C-alpha cells in the first residue's frame, strides 16, 4: 500500500507571470494516497381566437330580363326561357377572448442565471435568496468553453459493476414555434455487463472560434432556502456568456458558523438580469450547485482542514478515532473537511462524522502512478455512496500532472468522464482538480474547460524568500495570478500551511512558533478560501525535502 502513496519530489519551474522567487518548490510528497416538489407550473394563458363558419343551402336567385326593344313579333314556336342560378356561402366570424387567472402565484426556482456581456470589464452580480416549498425537477443550465473546430459537449456516461438497466433523466431542447424550448426527458438504457456506458450521447457541434456553450441540464430542488452568493466577473472579451453558479441551500443552525468576516449577503428579490459595472478587484465568491454550502473566497477565516485517516504506522485508523477527529475539526471552527481518496472507509466513516457534526466534505479521487485508469474505481465508489447533501466539491487528482502520473489532456478527459458519472448518480455540484501554479500556467488551456472552479495547492514555505509572517500575502499573490488563467472561474486554495519542524529553506524557517505565525497570516489574508494542511503530523511519510514532510499537522494552531 505504501508504494501506491509515495511520489517523487519534483521542482517547480519559473513563471512568466510570477517572480521565480515566488514559485513553490519540491512539494509533491504531501499528496500521497495514504496521504427545490415546487408548485406545479401554471398553465399558459393568453388570447384564443375562435372562427365559426356556417354553411347554408344553395339559393336560387332569378335574373330579371331587360325590357325588350320593339321588334317584329317572332313566331310563337321560337319563345325561350333562361334561368340563372348563383350559389352563395354565408360566413360569420366571432372572436372570443378568454382571460385566465392563475390559481397560484408564479414560483421562481433557484436555477442558474445566464448573463451575456457585450463589452469587457469587471461586473458585479448581486446576491440573491429564494425559498422553495416543494420538490421539483426542472431544466437548469451549465456551460463549457469549446475550442475552435468540431467539439462535443453534454451527454451522460455511467459506470456499472454488473448487468443493469439505467433510467436516466436528461435535458434537451425541442422546437417550439420559431424558437426552441428546454425540456426534461427520460431514457432507459440496458447495460449488459460491467463497464462504462454512454447513456445519453454528447452533442457534436462546430464553432469557428473559441466559444462558451450554454446548454440545459436536469436540476432537482428540495424544499428550503437557497442562496446565490454575489459574483464578481472579469470579462476579457466581448459577447461573453456567463452562467451564474447554482444557488446553494443554507445550512441548519446546528452547523458550524461561517467565518465571521465573510457572511453571505442576501436579498429577497428574484435574480435580476441587471449587471452593475464595478471597479472592484476582490476575488469572486465561489459557489456550488450541490446541496452543500460552499465557502466564500475572500477575507479571513478558516474554511477547511485536510484529513487523512491513517495511523503513524501508515495503517487505517479505527472508526472511533475517525469520528473523534472529525468532531475535533468541527470544535475548532471549521466548516469543511477535505478527503483525498476513498480508502480506509473514508466515505462511510468520515461521511458519518461530517453528518453528525454538520461539516461539509470536499471529496477526492486520487490518481497515482497507475494513471487515470487506476482511479476509476474511486469514481464508482463515490457515485455509489451518493451522499450528495454532504458534498460541495469533488477534486479529481491531486498534483497528478506535477507528479507525472498523467498528461493534462488525459486528466481533462478523465475529469469530464467522472463529472458525467457523478451527475448520473444525482450530483449537481462542482468538480475540479488541483495542481501547483506552474502546472496551471503551462496546462490551463487544456484543463479549464473541464473544471467548474480552479483548485490549487499553494504552499508559501517552498519559496525561499517568504517568511512565515508573509505567508498570507504570498498566497493571495498566487491567487491573483491563478484568477487570470481560467477567466470567469473562481479559485480555491485546496492546501496551505507551514511545517513545525525540519530544515530552513532560505527565509522560510520551520518551527512551532513560525507555524503559528504563518497560520495567523494565512487565516487573516486568505483563510476563507483555503483548506489548511493538515489535521495532524504524518509520521508514516518519508522526510522529503528539507525534512519537513512529516510535520505539517496544525489543528492545535486553531
From Swiss-Prot:
It is an enzyme of class 3 (hydrolase). Transmembrane segments: none annotated. Residues 1-18 form the signal peptide. The keyword Cell cycle does not apply. GO terms for molecular function: glucan endo-1,3-beta-D-glucosidase activity. Pathway: Glycan metabolism; cellulose degradation. Its EC number is 3.2.1.21. Residues 64-105, 251-305 are annotated as: Disordered. The active site is at residues 399, 495. It catalyses: Hydrolysis of terminal, non-reducing beta-D-glucosyl residues with release of beta-D-glucose. Keywords: Carbohydrate metabolism, Cell wall, Cellulose degradation, Glycosidase, Hydrolase, Polysaccharide degradation, Secreted, Signal. One of its GO terms (cellular component) is fungal-type cell wall. Its main location: secreted. It is found in: Secreted, Cell wall. One of its GO terms (biological process) is cell wall organization. Residues 293-305 have a biased composition (Polar residues). Residues 76-105, 252-292 have a biased composition (Low complexity). InterPro entries: Beta-glucan_modifiers, Glycoside_hydrolase_SF. Gene3D superfamilies: Glycosidases (3.20.20.80). Belongs to the glycosyl hydrolase 17 family. Beta-glucosidases are one of a number of cellulolytic enzymes involved in the degradation of cellulosic biomass. Catalyzes the last step releasing glucose from the inhibitory cellobiose. This is Probable beta-glucosidase btgE.
